[in-house]
From Swiss-Prot:
PANTHER family: ELONGATION FACTOR 1-BETA. Transmembrane segments: none annotated. Keywords: Elongation factor, Protein biosynthesis. It comes from Pyrobaculum calidifontis (strain DSM 21063 / JCM 11548 / VA1). The keyword Protein biosynthesis applies. This is Elongation factor 1-beta. It holds the Pfam family EF1_GNE. Signal peptide: none annotated. SUPFAM superfamilies: eEF-1beta-like. Disulfide bonds: none annotated. SMART domains: EF1_GNE. Belongs to the EF-1-beta/EF-1-delta family. The keyword Protein biosynthesis applies.
Protein backbone atom coordinates (compact mmCIF):
# COMPACT_ATOMS: atom_id res chain seq x y z
CA UNK A 1 0.00 0.00 0.00
CA UNK A 2 1.40 3.38 -0.93
CA UNK A 3 1.84 6.20 1.51
CA UNK A 4 0.19 9.59 1.32
CA UNK A 5 1.43 13.07 2.07
CA UNK A 6 -0.49 15.59 4.18
CA UNK A 7 -0.12 19.31 3.52
CA UNK A 8 -1.60 22.28 5.35
CA UNK A 9 -1.58 25.64 3.59
CA UNK A 10 -2.60 28.99 5.05
CA UNK A 11 -3.95 31.21 2.27
CA UNK A 12 -4.47 34.96 2.56
CA UNK A 13 -6.78 36.86 0.22
CA UNK A 14 -5.30 39.81 -1.67
CA UNK A 15 -7.68 42.25 0.09
CA UNK A 16 -10.56 42.43 2.58
CA UNK A 17 -12.93 42.85 -0.37
CA UNK A 18 -12.28 39.27 -1.52
CA UNK A 19 -15.18 36.95 -0.63
CA UNK A 20 -13.39 34.13 1.24
CA UNK A 21 -16.20 31.65 0.56
CA UNK A 22 -15.87 32.20 -3.20
CA UNK A 23 -12.08 32.05 -2.88
CA UNK A 24 -12.34 28.76 -0.96
CA UNK A 25 -14.62 27.30 -3.64
CA UNK A 26 -12.31 28.45 -6.45
CA UNK A 27 -9.25 26.88 -4.80
CA UNK A 28 -11.01 23.58 -4.03
CA UNK A 29 -12.29 23.39 -7.62
CA UNK A 30 -8.80 24.02 -9.04
CA UNK A 31 -7.17 21.40 -6.78
CA UNK A 32 -9.79 18.72 -7.50
CA UNK A 33 -9.88 16.02 -8.60
CA UNK A 34 -6.12 15.47 -8.46
CA UNK A 35 -5.63 16.68 -4.88
CA UNK A 36 -7.97 15.76 -2.02
CA UNK A 37 -9.03 18.65 0.22
CA UNK A 38 -10.06 17.08 3.53
CA UNK A 39 -11.00 20.27 5.34
CA UNK A 40 -10.94 24.06 5.02
CA UNK A 41 -10.97 26.35 8.05
CA UNK A 42 -11.62 30.08 8.09
CA UNK A 43 -9.39 32.01 10.50
CA UNK A 44 -10.31 35.51 11.65
CA UNK A 45 -7.13 37.59 11.67
CA UNK A 46 -8.56 41.02 12.50
CA UNK A 47 -9.76 44.21 10.84
CA UNK A 48 -12.06 42.14 8.60
CA UNK A 49 -9.22 40.03 7.26
CA UNK A 50 -9.73 36.27 7.12
CA UNK A 51 -7.29 33.51 6.19
CA UNK A 52 -8.15 30.09 4.83
CA UNK A 53 -6.41 26.93 6.03
CA UNK A 54 -6.50 24.02 3.56
CA UNK A 55 -5.86 20.43 4.69
CA UNK A 56 -4.75 18.57 1.57
CA UNK A 57 -3.85 14.92 0.97
CA UNK A 58 -2.04 13.44 -2.00
CA UNK A 59 -0.38 10.14 -2.88
CA UNK A 60 3.36 9.93 -2.40
CA UNK A 61 4.27 9.81 -6.08
CA UNK A 62 6.29 11.70 -8.67
CA UNK A 63 2.97 12.71 -10.29
CA UNK A 64 2.08 14.86 -7.26
CA UNK A 65 4.03 17.69 -5.64
CA UNK A 66 3.71 20.61 -3.27
CA UNK A 67 5.23 22.72 -6.06
CA UNK A 68 2.23 21.95 -8.25
CA UNK A 69 -0.17 22.79 -5.40
CA UNK A 70 1.61 26.14 -5.01
CA UNK A 71 1.38 26.83 -8.76
CA UNK A 72 -2.36 26.21 -8.53
CA UNK A 73 -2.69 28.54 -5.52
CA UNK A 74 -0.75 31.29 -7.35
CA UNK A 75 -3.04 30.96 -10.37
CA UNK A 76 -6.30 31.53 -8.45
CA UNK A 77 -7.61 35.08 -8.68
CA UNK A 78 -7.95 36.68 -5.25
CA UNK A 79 -5.04 34.84 -3.58
CA UNK A 80 -2.70 37.39 -2.03
CA UNK A 81 -0.25 34.96 -0.48
CA UNK A 82 0.12 31.56 1.13
CA UNK A 83 2.46 29.54 3.29
CA UNK A 84 3.01 25.84 3.81
CA UNK A 85 2.42 25.27 7.53
CA UNK A 86 2.66 21.48 7.69
CA UNK A 87 4.07 18.69 5.53
CA UNK A 88 4.11 15.07 6.63
CA UNK A 89 4.21 11.57 5.21
CA UNK A 90 1.26 9.39 6.19
CA UNK A 91 1.33 5.60 6.04
CA UNK A 92 -1.21 3.09 7.21
Amino acid sequence: MSAEVALVYRVLPESVEVDVEKLKEAIVNRLAPKYKVDKVEVEEIGFGIKALRFYIRMPESDEYSSDEVEEILRSVEGVGGFELEYFSRLSF
